[in-house]
């Protein structure tokens, strides 16, 4: 395996972390909050900055350049350096030569907030307990001397541990109540080599047969570093949306990361797909989101899971077993019945959203007039999901007739009630009043692809072309009076809408337009990184800058584009 460790990353854009860890080193310490110093941040029980890590020289703070690679992080100044590397998911090793470092805890300790610092007589390590995370943070000095301030202090007071500029090395761990004393079973150099090898192997699996680019390796790092081990309510290995403030798994975001994982690791992909289903309630509904210490049911997310599982099977590195298919069938069936039984008004054929959050497009202009609406995207997703359920039923020896009957009824209602002749509209459930049709949301029935009447598909393709900018499909036309450059779903370009639209266009036969959508989105990712969303005019990254569904979508589109290029070259060669 070639050494490709020259991938330089920006600590202000992505955190330093590793697969399986709930920890990271970052300057991002909260919702849109950036600190000057790097902090140790945990995502157990929420996002909590635990320790401020400040380089020191001659008794004063030292301004340093931060150099970040997938396997190491360093603070550098005039030949002096501090380095950090992960030693497993719950520990970091840090060492310095020519620079010291202060590990500082919050100054305030109350009965409910802050940290308590003490020296543990068992092994001589220093321990900080955190009310915010409910965990302990143990610093074990492996080399050099440290100064400790504020040990056993309660109330208000300084609390820090500081290593001097002479060579030093410290292990920093996140613990529960107790653990065996830290034992350095590998040298620092061995840990660096192990982390480098682990990341490169992961990136190679994720990339599969596709050509490697700086974009694919950076996307791989975003996914790798945001992956956490099972803990709390997260019962499977999971890719969080980010190890910045979006540190959850939302019940549609996960689908796009599952697709990215599928070619290299079908087991991880299936776990990612099924994770929200572990918290499916008695009605069949999925939670809005899941994270370490919280499962939210106040909203749901759109039922794209039939579409996603169809794509997942097509991309997976191995066939799914009959038992796995049966599990997916059972979960998808309950999820679909929720929409048909609990989200249709009496006498109505079409299901409804209760709020924009249910659609995933929280504040899209479709919801400006009314919030409780029968929306065309919802019906289209359920039509696909019913198709997938019928196919799974046939493969498993179950009856499929009811699924097909429900599918046909929804398809008739979608075209008969929400298609105006040149566009889809949403409508209020109670009044029947039509909602705005300028949002890209209303064009999402293109996911039905070849199932759409040709004249409907052509109009949707034309609408999508009108949303397309140099960087991808804007969620609101840039010439709309409701367009907002940083308006969340009122203008910016997003990964999920792009992937869904690209897939539908291709299946509907609009290959050239699908190619343009794919190329534009890949271009904006290569230019601006894997942001939560992008300014549709400038291409600048917006909001959370290390968003995994963006990285996952890029990898999916990149792999598909390379596969098409290869197929075209083979076709030319055969002529």
Please provide the spans of the model-predicted regions.
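Terminal accessory carbohydrate-recognition/targeting modules of carbohydrate-active enzymes
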Residues: 1-211, 244, 252, 507, ...
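Short, ordered beta-strand-loop transition motifs
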Residues: 85-90, 154, 163-164, 343-346, ...
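The feature captures the catalytic groove of carbohydrate-active enzymes
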Residues: 161-171, 175, 179-181, 283, ...
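Extended, well-ordered alpha-helical scaffold segments
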Residues: 191-194, 211-218, 265-278, 319-341, ...
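Extended glycan-interaction surfaces of carbohydrate-active proteins
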Residues: 209-247, 272-292, 344-373, 412-493, ...
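Aromatic- and histidine-enriched alpha-helix N-cap/loop-to-helix transition segments
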Residues: 214, 245-256, 264, 296-307, ...
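Alpha-helical support elements that line or immediately flank enzyme active sites
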Residues: 248-279, 441-453, 498-511, 518
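Specific register positions within alpha-helical solenoid repeats of the TPR/Sel1-like families, i.e.
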Residues: 259-263, 307-314, 387, 394, ...
């Amino acid at each position: 395996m070639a050494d490709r460790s020259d991938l330089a990353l920006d600590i202000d854009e992505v955190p330093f972390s590793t697969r399986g860890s709930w920890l990271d080193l970052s300057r991002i310490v909260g919702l849109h909050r950036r600190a000057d110093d790097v902090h140790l941040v945990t995502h157990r029980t929420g996002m909590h900055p635990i320790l401020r890590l400040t380089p020191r020289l001659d008794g004063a703070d030292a301004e340093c350049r931060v150099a970040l690679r997938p396997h190491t992080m360093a603070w550098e100044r005039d030949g002096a350096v501090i380095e950090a590397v992960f030693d497993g998911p719950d520990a970091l090793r840090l060492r310095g030569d020519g620079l010291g470092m202060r590990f500082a805890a919050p100054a305030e300790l109350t009965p409910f907030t802050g940290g308590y610092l003490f020296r543990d007589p068992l092994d001589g390590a220093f321990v900080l307990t955190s009310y915010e995370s409910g965990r302990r943070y143990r610093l074990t000095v492996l080399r050099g001397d440290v100064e400790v301030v504020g040990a056993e202090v309660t109330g208000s007071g300084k609390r820090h541990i500081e290593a001097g500029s002479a060579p030093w090395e410290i292990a920093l761990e996140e613990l529960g109540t107790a653990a065996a004393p830290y034992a350095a079973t590998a040298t620092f150099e061995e840990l660096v080599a192990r982390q480098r090898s682990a990341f490169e192997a992961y990136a190679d699996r994720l990339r599969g047969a596709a050509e490697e680019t700086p974009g694919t390796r950076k996307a791989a790092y975003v996914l790798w570093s945001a992956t956490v081990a099972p803990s709390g309510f997260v019962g499977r290995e999971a890719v969080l949306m980010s190890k910045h403030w979006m540190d959850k798994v939302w019940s549609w975001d996960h689908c796009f990361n599952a697709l990215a994982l599928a070619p290299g690791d079908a087991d991880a992909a299936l776990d990612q797909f099924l994770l929200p289903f572990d918290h499916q309630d008695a009605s069949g509904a999925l939670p809005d989101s899941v994270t370490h210490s919280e499962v939210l049911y106040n909203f749901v997310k759109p039922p794209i899971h039939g579409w996603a599982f169809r794509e997942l099977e097509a991309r997976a590195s191995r066939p799914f077993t009959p038992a796995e298919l049966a599990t997916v069938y059972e979960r998808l069936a309950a999820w679909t019945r929720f929409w048909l039984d609990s989200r249709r008004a009496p006498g109505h054929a079409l299901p409804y959203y209760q709020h924009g959050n249910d659609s995933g497009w929280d504040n899209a202009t479709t919801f400006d007039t009314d919030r409780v609406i029968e929306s065309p995207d919802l019906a289209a997703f359920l039509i696909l999901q019913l198709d997938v359920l019928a196919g799974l039923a046939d493969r498993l020896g179950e009856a499929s007739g009811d699924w097909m009957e429900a599918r046909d009824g929804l398809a008739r209602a979608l075209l008969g009630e929400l298609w105006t002749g040149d566009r889809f509209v949403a409508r209020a459930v109670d009044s029947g009043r039509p909602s705005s049709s300028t949002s890209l949301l209303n064009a999402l029935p293109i996911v039905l692809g070849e199932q759409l009447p040709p004249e409907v598909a052509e109009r949707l393709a034309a609408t999508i072309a009108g949303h397309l900018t140099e960087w991808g499909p804007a969620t609101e036309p840039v010439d709309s009076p409701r367009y907002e450059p940083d308006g969340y779903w009122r203008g910016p370009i997003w990964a999920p809408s792009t992937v869904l639209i690209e897939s539908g266009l291709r299946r509907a036969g609009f290959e050239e337009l699908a190619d343009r959508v794919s190329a534009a989105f890949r271009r904006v990712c290569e230019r601006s990184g894997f942001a939560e969303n992008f300014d549709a005019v400038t291409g600048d990254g917006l909001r959370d800058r290390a968003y995994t569904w963006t990285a996952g979508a890029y990898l999916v589109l990149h792999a598909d584009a390379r596969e098409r290029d290869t197929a075209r070259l083979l076709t030319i060669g055969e002529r």
